[in-house]
């Protein structure tokens, strides 16, 4: 299916701008976070945004030349490691949490707010979308942003209440067994 309108191209251009801002935010947050868990999480989110940008830019370039196929907008299953990749390491190490990133909980909350604004933007555009491929693209973007939001929420929980985080993630019981 060949590209016929500029609506999808405009949308992709806007998405690239949003992703660039998110990538810059995560790079900045990683540089300011003195704790390895926070730094690793922010770096992982930055790298995920870069992968999304690479794919979006390549697809946009092909479509804007008229040589692209709208099927290129169909995203494969995106990588959503969630908290399992970073947080699994914590459960194994069971290191004590430094207070280095407690000051950066505000950065985590800002990231959550940024992801939430992205979700709201994509939901609003989804309501207006008429083309099935555009709807599929937006649905994918919403799922992607939600996975990032969940990862940040988990990181915030880890820093705010580490003991309960370990109890919940480690499936620790309180019966003493």
Regions found by a protein language model. Name each.
Residues 1-177:
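Non-heme di-metal
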